Amino acid sequence: KYTSQELRELEYDQTAALAGYGDYRILPEIAEWDYGRAEGRTRQQVSEASGFAWDVWRDGPRSLNPGLEGDWIETLPSGEQVPVHNGPGEDVEEAAARTRDAIERVLPLLNVGHDVLLVAHAHILRILTSQWLGVDPHFARLLRLDTAHYCILSQYKGDNVIERWNC
């Protein structure tokens, strides 16, 4: 049995290996956005529980009733049961601060010409992209990044740019 984090690390390891990057490091700075009180619930469920049309980008998890925090066992459609923990979560600015730290960690490699592959969930990668571009992290909501797709961030004439997106 593996914990959620161990399973994610195995998935990331396999993804990195398939992309030709066998040597990897875990960057906690690009861990999945902590949805807190919304974790394990659909947007519809959260909206019903909160009494308003909740949106993670606009409202964040801390806008939700603290009564939504706690621990429970969720049963997946496959029948598998997984533990869910809900704390207060983090707002988009806190997630953005983490991604700025990740960028700072990989910049020395980029500055000497190395390629860097970051494997993570779409929301945190969208937020990271906003920080790469130097724009407000809420801009990330406008960047569609589908499951199992990639993007390439690079520099062009001294500016951080998006070279390819949602490929």
Language-model segments: what does each one mean?
Residues W33-Q45, P108, V112-H114, S130-C167:
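Acidic, low-complexity terminal tails and accessory targeting/binding regions
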Residues A96, R100-P108, T129:
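Generic structural signal for well-ordered alpha-helical scaffold segments
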Residues G51-E94:
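Short glycine/proline- and acidic residue-enriched helix-loop micro-motifs
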Residues T3, A97, V119-A120:
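Short beta-strand scaffold positions
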Residues A122-R126, Y156:
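GST superfamily/GST-like fold recognition
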Residues L10-Q14, E104, R126-I127:
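Alpha-helical elements of the RecA-like P-loop NTPase motor core of helicases
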Residues K1-G67, D159:
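Phosphate-coordination/substrate-recognition cap region in phosphate-metabolizing enzymes
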Residues V112-A122:
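Generic beta-sheet signal
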